[in-house]
Amino acid sequence: MAVKRAPSKKPRPVEGRKPKKNPLFAAKIEHVDYKDINLLRTFISDRGKIRSRRVTGLTPQQQRQVAVAVKNAREMALLPFTSR
């Protein structure tokens, strides 16, 4: 038997969410370079994890480029693997 839930108190927006701004399109960057540490730090959380597409607003291709660039920068010791 299913239990009926009370309706949520907060009404949902009717029009939906507006898409996030793409930071790479805004900066007119076509290729992500692993040596551009300031750019890569915007896509890394304070714990050292790569942020998801939902958070960053990147396209799938750009997200893959960022992930590869971050991993290369970590191997070259330009970025830490974790933050303490």
From Swiss-Prot:
Region (Disordered): 1-21
Source taxon at top rank: Bacteria
SUPFAM superfamilies given in the database record: Ribosomal protein S18 (SSF46911)
One Pfam entry name: Ribosomal_S18
Biased segments, Basic residues type: 1-11
Alphabetic keyword roster: Ribonucleoprotein, Ribosomal protein, RNA-binding, rRNA-binding
Single Gene Ontology MF annotation: structural constituent of ribosome
GO biological process terms, semicolon-separated: translation
Keyword rRNA-binding included in the entry's annotation: yes
InterPro entries per record: Ribosomal_bS18, Ribosomal_bS18_CS, Ribosomal_bS18_sf
Signal peptide feature range: none
GO cellular component: cytosolic small ribosomal subunit
Recorded family membership: Belongs to the bacterial ribosomal protein bS18 family.
Function: Binds as a heterodimer with protein bS6 to the central domain of the 16S rRNA, where it helps stabilize the platform of the 30S subunit.
Subunit annotation: Part of the 30S ribosomal subunit. Forms a tight heterodimer with protein bS6.
Record-linked PANTHER family: 30S RIBOSOMAL PROTEIN S18, SMALL RIBOSOMAL SUBUNIT PROTEIN BS18M
Annotated protein name in UniProt: Small ribosomal subunit protein bS18B
Record organism: Rhodococcus jostii (strain RHA1)
